[in-house]
């Protein structure tokens, strides 16, 4: 097999041109086989095989650098840089990351995981190169989805201003190029990338600039775009920004891609290559259902059906159901997502109430301020977003929502440890970054019924509130404990005295396990479902001091600025002396891996917490 010849970076350059297509097919089959076992981002990687091969053939890595936006489409890059064996443990505990990691390989130029960052990072590397007097090529690869994020345009605007050599590749997998459109696109691409065109353009501009008043003439020429040119030549939006546009280019034609990359290296200033690819290319189920195979669980190759289909509802399913009920009950309820209607569970709401559903693209900042405007206009907006992505809209939460005390509900999915996507996606900071904002309220449900109750409470609150819930199966235990939700009030599940286990959200289930372990050791333990992180139930905390010897706080959030620190502050403010143990996530980023294994690693499983308690007694 040709793929067996790829053992390290630049081995691809030893492959004969006539074998490029065969190698691409082998890479696709390798990816399908491996990801069917481990799970991972399949669709985007199948679509980027030829593009990645072309980049490795046209560039001199690692001196030249590639920055992958989001980074989930970097699997072929990992294969071509000698990491084939890592796919056996892809995204597994202590295994290979599913994203670029500088600590994993010198060929990974920049860590990514969130969208729309690659152009900014690439431009920074470009200016570092210039300041050091180097002549390397820097390429940022960004998808059409990521180009909906405002940061990408901020970076493009800056790139045009800096007038330094920089290549941006737009990997557009929104649609395939049909035969008719393909012919026209190829014709226009040949004109735009022809050496003569580039030489003529540069020659004219240089000649004019050498004359008195030439700069003004050049600027007027650049602004003078005829209506015909606007209609006929694609990419004029980028050209008007001062970024040279090349394309559209067939993203599955390796030699054509190499040619346009070589031409882009000749362009003075920033250049954008528009590449058209097909998401899921080469695997029928992924071509037919690209969204399903964006982030795939292990699946049967022949059918594409998940190997272990879910049989019980997860928290996203519960949220989806209650959203539809809320929408039916109140016509003022509107739903907002940042390009994730499926992942956040809003697809059903969208189908039922299309006029009250808003997908704003990968634009979390806009999503939050848009929600603030809706709230100011009398609506009841619910922003459904992953915890790690809400970080991108911190100023909007503070400035646009909370200062005005607007009733925006933040439904925070993937809160806590999420597992295989690693550091960039762990939702372990939201208690901390939200709790310091005046007017913000934060709560977390212990089980699926409480999530439904909290969402109903949140919509009725008339103030900013975040409801955070984890990834995975919705806990169905403790069904008999369903006291009405009251602002800032905890729920006593069991009161025995001895050790008071104050647990937040997903940690209530763990508290049950800790209590059982303590019983085995002869200790009594109470379980308190904290419910609210802000405001905390100070009355419950002080009450626990009366008949308990120790307070233990349990949270799936970093300890710094979290629930435990708020409990300690309460005790200090009221001059209460009692032994305390805080169980949470340490001051460190948590890598990828199975959530249960990660909890053991950081001491957040029931056994580790129990041992910590016993040491303190």
Residue ranges of model-derived segments:
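N-terminal amphipathic, basic-rich helices that act as targeting or association modules
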Residues: 1-80, 239, 243-258, 267, ...
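Long, well-ordered, tryptophan-enriched scaffold segments
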Residues: 3, 174-319
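Non-catalytic terminal/interface segments that mediate subunit docking, oligomerization
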Residues: 65, 277-390, 396-406, 463, ...
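Glycine-/acidic-rich phosphate or pyrophosphate-binding loops and their flanking alpha/beta elements
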Residues: 259-262, 294-295, 304, 314-329, ...
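Cofactor-binding active-site loop characterized by glycine-rich and histidine/acidic residues
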Residues: 41-162, 315, 332-333, 337-338, ...
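A glycine-rich helix N-cap at a beta->alpha junction
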Residues: 86-96, 161-175, 196, 402-414
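Peripheral docking tails and interdomain loops at the edges
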Residues: 298, 302, 306-311, 419-421, ...
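Structural signature of the thiamine diphosphate
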Residues: 217-285, 407-412, 431-480, 606-617
């Amino acid at each position: 097999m040709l793929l067996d010849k790829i053992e390290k970076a630049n081995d691809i350059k030893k492959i004969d041109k006539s074998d490029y297509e065969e190698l691409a097919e082998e890479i696709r089959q390798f990816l399908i086989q491996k990801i069917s076992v481990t799970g991972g981002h399949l669709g985007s990687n199948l679509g980027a095989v030829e593009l990645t091969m072309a980049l490795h053939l046209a560039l001199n890595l690692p001196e030249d650098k590639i920055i992958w936006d989001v980074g989930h489409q970097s699997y072929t890059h990992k294969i071509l840089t000698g990491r084939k064996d890592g796919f056996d443990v892809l995204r597994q505990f202590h295994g290979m990351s599913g994203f670029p990691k500088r600590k994993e390989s010198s060929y990974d130029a920049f860590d990514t995981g969130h969208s729309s960052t690659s152009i900014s990072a690439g431009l920074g590397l470009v200016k570092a190169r210039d300041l050091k007097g180097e002549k390397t090529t820097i390429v940022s690869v960004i998808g059409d989805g990521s180009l909906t994020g405002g940061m990408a345009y901020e970076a493009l605007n800056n790139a045009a201003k800096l007038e330094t050599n920089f290549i941006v590749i737009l990997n557009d997998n929104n649609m395939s190029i049909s035969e008719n459109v393909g012919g026209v696109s190829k014709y226009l691409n040949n004109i735009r990338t022809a050496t003569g065109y580039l030489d003529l353009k540069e020659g004219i501009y240089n000649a004019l600039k050498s004359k008195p008043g030439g700069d003004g003439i050049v600027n007027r020429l650049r602004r003078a775009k005829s209506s015909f040119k606007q209609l006929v030549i694609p990419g004029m939006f980028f050209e008007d920004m001062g970024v040279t546009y090349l394309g559209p280019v067939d993203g599955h034609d390796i030699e054509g891609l190499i040619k346009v990359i070589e031409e882009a290296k000749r362009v003075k200033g920033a250049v954008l290559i528009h590449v058209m690819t097909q998401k899921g290319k080469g695997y029928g189920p992924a071509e037919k259902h690209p969204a399903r195979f964006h982030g795939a669980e292990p699946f049967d190759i022949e059918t594409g059906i998940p190997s272990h289909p879910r049989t019980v509802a997860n928290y996203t399913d519960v949220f989806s159901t209650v959203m539809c009920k809320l929408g039916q009950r109140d016509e003022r309820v509107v739903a907002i997502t940042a390009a994730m209607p499926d992942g956040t569970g809003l697809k059903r709401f969208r189908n039922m109430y299309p006029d009250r559903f808003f997908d704003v693209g990968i634009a979390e900042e806009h999503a939050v301020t848009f929600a603030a405007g809706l709230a100011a206009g009398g609506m009841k907006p619910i922003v459904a977003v992953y915890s790690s992505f809400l970080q991108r809209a911190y100023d909007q939460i503070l400035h646009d929502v909370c200062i005005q005390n607007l009733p925006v509900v933040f439904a925070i999915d993937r809160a806590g440890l999420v597992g295989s996507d690693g550091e960039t996606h762990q939702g372990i900071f939201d208690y901390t970054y939200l709790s310091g904002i005046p007017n913000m309220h934060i709560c977390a449900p212990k089980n699926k019924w409480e999530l439904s109750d909290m969402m109903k409470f949140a919509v009725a609150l008339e103030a900013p509130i975040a409801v955070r819930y984890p990834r995975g199966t919705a806990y169905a235990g403790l069904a008999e404990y369903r006291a009405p939700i009251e602002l800032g009030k905890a729920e006593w599940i069991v009161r025995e005295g001895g050790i008071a286990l104050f647990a937040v959200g997903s940690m209530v289930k763990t508290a049950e396990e800790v209590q059982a372990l303590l019983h085995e050791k002869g200790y009594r333990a109470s379980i308190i479902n904290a419910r609210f992180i802000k405001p905390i139930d100070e009355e419950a905390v002080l009450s626990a001091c009366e008949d308990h010897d120790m307070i233990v706080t349990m949270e799936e959030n970093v300890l710094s600025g979290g629930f435990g620190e708020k409990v300690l502050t309460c005790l200090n403010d009221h001059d209460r002396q009692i032994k305390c143990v805080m169980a949470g996530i340490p001051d460190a980023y948590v890598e990828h891996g199975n959530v249960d294994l990660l909890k053991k690693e950081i001491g957040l499983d029931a056994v580790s917490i129990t041992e910590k308690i016993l040491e303190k007694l």
